[in-house]
């Protein structure tokens, strides 16, 4: 069933981010703790924007949840570290054209895109962001502006999932980036990225419990938090038999 997402008109941060995306070319980093409406914002933008856009995410599950594609599949990225000194990613002499060999429709899509949305940005490595920047510059025929002049919307929470970096990859990336996180990408030294943090938690209504979750999130748990959590230890929950099913159709039956 198709659901229309209605924004909270009293939520100033939501409205500020919405106005920037809808009525300007300003790139935005939208963040906030769990349950503050990041996914709702993303869906609302996708449903209402008139801009030609694409929704991307670092993993298949995240891409499905966001209603988009993975970064690697959309840009045809290799899975090894995409280093700034790799000649295949050079802006000179058509090297990117030679390496990626996109189809004509895909090249046209990259050129005409106005808004690039990346969900779960906390899981995206810095080198991937820099590679996307170079690709968009080349296929937008705009080498001077970051991301080829495209508007970028990054959505996520750096307190949640981090980039997956294997041991040998970390050693390689450390030569070029202070951290593997997206915000260490070199392109962000050239772009005015506005950060907006959603504040209102919609998922939980118990303010005391929300405060405990905040303390866990920021690694500032105190004795009072532990005492409160321990009051729930040993609580009896009604048991029922679990039935493992392999398809949603079977579950519906």
Across the structure, where does each feature detected by a protein language model lie?
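Extended, polar beta-sheet/loop recognition surfaces of beta-rich domains
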Residues: 253
């Amino acid at each position: 069933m198709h659901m229309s997402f209605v924004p909270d008109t009293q939520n100033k941060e939501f409205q500020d981010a919405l106005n920037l995306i809808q009525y300007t070319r300003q790139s935005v980093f939208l963040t906030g703790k769990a349950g503050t409406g990041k996914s709702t914002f993303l869906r609302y933008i996708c449903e209402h924007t008139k801009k030609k856009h694409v929704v991307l995410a670092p993993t298949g599950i995240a891409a499905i949840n966001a209603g988009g594609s993975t970064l690697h599949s959309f840009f045809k990225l290799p899975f090894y570290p995409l280093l700034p000194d790799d000649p295949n990613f050079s802006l000179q002499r058509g090297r990117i054209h030679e390496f990626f060999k996109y189809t004509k429709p895909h090249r046209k899509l990259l050129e005409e895109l106005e808004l690039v949305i990346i969900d779960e940005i906390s899981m995206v490595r810095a080198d991937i962001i820099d590679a996307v920047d170079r690709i968009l510059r080349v296929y937008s025929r705009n080498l001077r502006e970051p991301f080829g002049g495209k508007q970028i919307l990054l959505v996520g929470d750096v307190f949640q999932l981090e980039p997956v970096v294997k041991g040998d990859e970390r050693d390689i990336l450390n030569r070029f980036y202070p951290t593997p996180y997206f915000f260490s990408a070199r392109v962000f030294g050239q772009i005015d990225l506005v950060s907006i943090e959603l504040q209102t938690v919609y998922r939980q209504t118990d303010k005391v419990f929300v405060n405990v979750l905040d303390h866990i999130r920021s690694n500032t748990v105190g004795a009072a938090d532990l005492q409160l959590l321990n009051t729930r230890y040993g609580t009896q929950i009604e048991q029922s038999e679990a039935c493992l099913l392999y398809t949603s159709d079977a579950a519906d039956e």
